[in-house]
């Protein structure tokens, strides 16, 4: 009974301690209000933060934010995107927020500093079934936490419980076309697969992706094993309706364009008209394209007839087929032009890109290239992206750059210094 009471307390939605807004100057359509902000008693604290973040240098002057033209005073292009943090201007916060008729819709994203289970549970009513894509890279199930800013030395059962509790709530955040990516390594991929099968359903498993990781020099430690070079990312959807756009990658070698025989598709088909000549496909085969498509390809110069006997080529410039002018034999094969190819549809092997990055010297910082592929393959502009093991903030940063809305949850102090 005591344990049940503890569970009830743990699951009770928590109160928000405080909330602040970061709004760029160009979004505030009130010059008088901007002047109030820039003349505020706390503006020096805001400037100090800008300097620490590298947004302005030590020579910055408030008066440089405005300029005058024939229409009067306006924001300069150089400083119109300076971000105002309302934590420094609490007495002006309501006036700033009143500039937006629909504040929720105006916001690009939400950053939440909290233990993630409590955040997911508390804010669920606001975002239930509204998220399109979730990406998480939870703490790996390792023996030690020495190299990380967060705990990784969980027992298998504890680690499984930690993930299960959060994944169950996270599923409720996803809409019917939504999907989730969960990154893990060889220590825990078997646990993650079982959990995702149970929570999302085996029928909603989509892919087991592999991504590159940093290799450790195991030879120096005299460990008799191959260095781990890959991590796993499991992709699950909420239903058959899930949104997916095939990503492409550059081919290692460019494939030149070429003429290809049109009659190599299995299954007997009917004759088609080529340059006024009716041709039946080979026995047991059918012409690859419809008559409408064949006519279009002829008009575009992308279809020819080749004489099997002498190799004579008949194309659009020669009009209707009147027989082979070279050998007189009427034995033809239609061919169509296959364009050169520098890209190919990506498969589940994502080792062509780096899975980690060192931009911020943050342990296990996921690369922007990886997150770009994740987000573009499962969402569209203005869709909502979430990461509740945010770490260095790559997911929300890339979502923002790609024109998506975003939610990030992180509890560490790097929430302020890195995210």
PLM-predicted stretches and their roles:
Residues 172, 397-398:
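Hydrophobic/aromatic ligand-binding patch that stacks against planar heteroaromatic rings
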Residues 389-391:
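Class I SAM-dependent methyltransferase "Motif I" SAM/SAH-binding loop
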Residues 405-407:
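Short beta-strand element of Class I
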Residues 419:
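Conserved SAM-binding loop
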């Amino acid at each position: 009974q005591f344990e049940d009471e503890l569970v009830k307390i743990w699951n009770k939605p928590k109160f928000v301690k405080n909330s602040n807004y970061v709004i760029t100057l160009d979004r505030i359509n009130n010059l008088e209000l901007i002047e109030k902000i820039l003349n505020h008693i706390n503006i020096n604290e805001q400037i100090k933060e800008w300097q620490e973040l590298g947004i302005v240098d030590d020579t910055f002057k408030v008066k440089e934010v405005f300029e005058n033209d024939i229409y009067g005073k306006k924001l300069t292009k150089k400083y119109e995107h300076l971000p105002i943090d309302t934590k420094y201007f609490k007495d002006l916060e309501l006036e700033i927020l009143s500039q937006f008729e629909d504040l929720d819709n105006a916001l690009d994203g939400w950053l939440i500093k909290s233990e993630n289970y409590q955040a997911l549970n508390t804010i669920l009513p606001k975002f239930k079934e509204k998220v399109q894509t979730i990406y998480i890279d939870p703490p790996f199930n390792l023996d030690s936490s020495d190299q990380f800013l967060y705990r990784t030395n969980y027992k298998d059962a504890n680690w499984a419980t930690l993930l299960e509790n959060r994944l169950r709530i996270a599923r409720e955040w996803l809409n019917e076309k939504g999907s989730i990516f969960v990154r893990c390594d060889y220590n825990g991929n078997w646990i993650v697969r079982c959990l995702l099968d149970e929570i999302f359903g085996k029928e909603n498993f989509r892919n087991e992706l592999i991504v590159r990781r940093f290799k450790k020099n195991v030879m120096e430690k005299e460990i008799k094993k191959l260095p781990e070079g890959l991590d796993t990312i499991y992709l699950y959807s909420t239903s058959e309706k899930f949104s997916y756009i095939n990503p492409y990658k550059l081919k290692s070698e460019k494939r030149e364009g070429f003429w290809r025989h049109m009659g190599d598709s299995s299954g007997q088909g009917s004759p088609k008209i080529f340059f006024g000549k009716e041709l039946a496909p080979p026995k047991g085969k059918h012409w690859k394209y419809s008559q409408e498509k064949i006519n279009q390809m002829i008009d575009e110069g992308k279809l020819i007839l080749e004489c099997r006997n002498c190799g004579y080529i008949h194309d659009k410039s020669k009009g209707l087929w009147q027989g082979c002018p070279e050998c007189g034999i009427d034995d033809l094969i239609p061919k169509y032009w296959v364009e050169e190819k520098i890209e190919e549809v990506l498969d589940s092997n994502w080792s062509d890109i780096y899975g980690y990055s060192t931009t911020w010297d943050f342990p296990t910082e996921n690369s922007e290239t990886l997150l770009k592929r994740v987000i573009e393959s499962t969402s569209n502009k203005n869709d909502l992206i979430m990461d509740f093991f945010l770490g260095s903030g790559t997911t929300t940063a890339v979502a923002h750059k790609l024109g998506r809305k975003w939610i990030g949850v992180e509890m560490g102090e790097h929430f302020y210094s890195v995210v």
